[in-house]
Amino acid sequence: MATKIRLQRHGRKGYAFYKIVVADSRAPRDGKFIERIGSYNPNTNPATIDLNFERALYWIGVGAQPTDTARNILSREGVLMMKHLLGGVKKGAFDQAAAESKFEAWLKGKKDALNNMKAKVKEAAVADDKVKLEAEKAVNKARAEAVAEKKAAEAKAKAEAEAAAAAEEATETEETPMEAAAEEAPAAESAE
């Protein structure tokens, strides 16, 4: 039977995640499968892959053909590297212990690279948050200054209005004694 290792789509529209399955090559994409060997979620950064390494190695060993994306996933997880090393053991190029040590060294390098990538993503997110915070502080400061200027202008206008009202009131009080004195003066003249 011609078998393929491929992805079976699940999830909602716009947020797909996949099961990694071994299926007959003639079966539909989301149809019947022989065995589920893992899952793949490309929505996270970096993509989340959960793979049963031994079963994937078995199916590759018996001739299952991976699709392009499944091949990339198997390569990233080291299944294809292990198949390559086991081929060298079969040919007698080196023994099983040497193959294991080479695989461990390769896997350590891959994990270090993945951890570095995760750290860079995290640092970029922190830096982006810091820039956004600084921009928000600048906007808030500008708004506060605008509000302070508006309040100062209102206070100045109110003070000017109060001063004008006080000056007008003072002129009214000054005019009243003069008028009263003027009225008293003609009355005093007429009395004489």
UniProtKB/Swiss-Prot annotation:
The keyword Ribonucleoprotein applies. The keyword Ribonucleoprotein applies. InterPro entries: Ribosomal_bS16, Ribosomal_bS16_dom_sf. Residues 149-192 are annotated as: Disordered. GO terms for biological process: translation. Coiled coil: none annotated. Residues 178-192 have a biased composition (Low complexity). It comes from the Bacteria. Residues 149-161 have a biased composition (Basic and acidic residues). GO terms for molecular function: structural constituent of ribosome. GO terms for cellular component: cytoplasm; small ribosomal subunit. Keywords: Ribonucleoprotein, Ribosomal protein. Belongs to the bacterial ribosomal protein bS16 family. PANTHER family: 30S RIBOSOMAL PROTEIN S16 (PTHR12919), SMALL RIBOSOMAL SUBUNIT PROTEIN BS16M (PTHR12919:SF20). NCBIfam families: PRK14521.1 (NF011094), S16 (TIGR00002). This is Small ribosomal subunit protein bS16. It comes from Porphyromonas gingivalis (strain ATCC 33277 / DSM 20709 / CIP 103683 / JCM 12257 / NCTC 11834 / 2561).
